[in-house]
């Protein structure tokens, strides 16, 4: 493949073509300095994005300025609302199916698997799986909301590639930063924290982000900065208050549906 790797080239390609070009050029990058072989591809991808990042972000920002900017508050609000409403719709569909399945288990399962099933406690049977599933699914929602900003690249959305341990790439202070984006400051357990340090540590300008400034930090590394809540959203020029308001409405809607299903 003789196509030159440049931001201008990638911009004109489809996501599939971008992925193919990045895969080829990434394979040419020496990664023998990275001890953990599981992170070789992530390191190569990171080097590729670092090389084209500034120009790619410049294109995104200029494109946004030429049109009615997504950073205008009304536009931001509409885009965030669209994503949270779609999330609520899809999660409520899953919730109804889950309740139906759990109800069937309680009514027809001759061999209960736990005390809650034995006692027919429908709400207790479903509550753990619901909150666990909700927390997991919301992880991608933060990426989708962040991706509204022209100062953010989500590699999976933009290039069709997954960089192990990296959720978003952002530009701030004229630097390209590679970040993990979690829901809360205490999202990671001890073993997960150690893995995150390795995954972030292979990149220049790593960053650990909590979407909301809630709880206590479980991630701590002197070489990897961490930010939370409004500080992060301000960094990518999105209005934190809008995000919090739309998330509140979304979760209240899901909570109301959960309560109605439990009452049946």
List the predicted regions and their residue ranges:
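A residue-identity detector for tryptophan
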Residues: 56-59, 94, 142, 188, ...
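Amphipathic alpha-helical interaction segments
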Residues: 102, 150, 240-241
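Catalytic cores of nucleic-acid endonucleases
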Residues: 183-237
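Interdomain/boundary linker segments immediately adjacent to catalytic/signaling cores
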Residues: 2-140
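Noncatalytic linker/hinge segments flanking ATPase motor cores
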Residues: 119-123, 206-210, 218-223, 247-254
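Catalytic centers of nucleases
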Residues: 136-199
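Long, charge-rich low-complexity segments
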Residues: 68-92, 179-204
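Non-catalytic C-terminal interaction segments of nucleic acid-processing enzymes
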Residues: 238-264
